[in-house]
């Protein structure tokens, strides 16, 4: 089914949720209708078949942990949370020789502006995430796992807890899963809405009951993670992709996408599009196709710019974005990041100064305050952009923004500082003329003499 056929189907049904026919070859959203999230529904969609295959239940030999890791490596699955690190390689970092407790953690702290895919996964397909985490635990020899869920989606947290109870009752979780001798305990944990807890080490601090602030790295979580033990953290969508890979093989997953960018990816389309929502398409899909699935730019207006991977990714002007395919390598070559897959579309009515002002305020508000460049610099960025937007900008402000961004980027413990600095630099690179025009207008108003009350009366009298 091509994009136009999918769109026609959507328009005919009038469906307004993510349970639409606008996906292309879906693997994660396939068969969902918003009500069929329970265990019996998931099993009807081949749910837990990958787990049974891995454990050798129902015929065939059990896979070894090394075989599971090798299959995930072959799939070219890359982390879906933002960094795009190869998942199989990350799993291989878990020390095999370590005999103490080891942990696997799911990062469902979805706080990136524009991103809403993980929420839908946990709400409407929670068992796929659970199965993926069980497989990961088997591959890495871990016995306990946690899913850290964003604190502002408490209903989703409750839904995931219900799914966990179903999985435990059916023998998919516990000390002896399906009689295999393999045991894994999985727990849900909710945060309190802090954006910084999406950073993996801040997340681990929060799970431990501490203030959510990033740790210095190294040591990395694979050697010193939760409670000081080896830990692997992956994104919700990453875990959700694993069951399909184990059922069908790594090679089949690569063929669903493109080399070095295997499988499908969920994109959260928002901004100036007719049909905002989540879309699952193969990696490497042209951006134009994705935009078409979302109904195109609203009211038929002209595309101006796109933020392709959530608010922390650099903005790209329309011409660069339309030449991209939706995968890590293509977006990086264009000068941005695929990130979490949160695609924010901007039409030709958007003021880029105002857009940057909103982004800068978010990062100033969400800085944990641990690092001086981020704590002080994000405030400076917002205040300067706010000054320009309010008509009080000075020509030197643009150099000041560049200087502050330079003093933040690469100088903080975590990437929040980079996330605040990169949008500023990208906006100034591609849309500097808008900032200059606003500053020039402010200067013109400042330099234009204002007549006093008496001068206005005298002038009017002479004119009469």
Segments predicted by a language model, with ranges:
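Histidine-anchored nucleotide/phosphate-binding helix
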Residues: 125-139
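Ferredoxin-type iron-sulfur electron-transfer modules in oxidoreductases and energy-metabolism complexes
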Residues: 1, 49-74, 100-104, 108, ...
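Gly-rich Lys/Arg/Thr-decorated short loops/hinges at beta-loop-alpha junctions or inter-strand turns
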Residues: 34, 42-49, 106-118, 221-227, ...
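Cofactor-/ligand-binding subdomain signature composed of acidic, glycine-rich
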Residues: 2-69
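Conserved phosphate/anionic-ligand binding catalytic regions in large, soluble enzymes, centered on
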Residues: 47, 72-94, 136, 191-205, ...
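Accessory "access/gating" subregions that flank catalytic or transport cores
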Residues: 54-97, 255, 260, 268, ...
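Short amphipathic, charge-patterned alpha-helical segments
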Residues: 132-136, 282-300
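Hydrophobic alpha-helical positions that pack around
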Residues: 157-283, 295
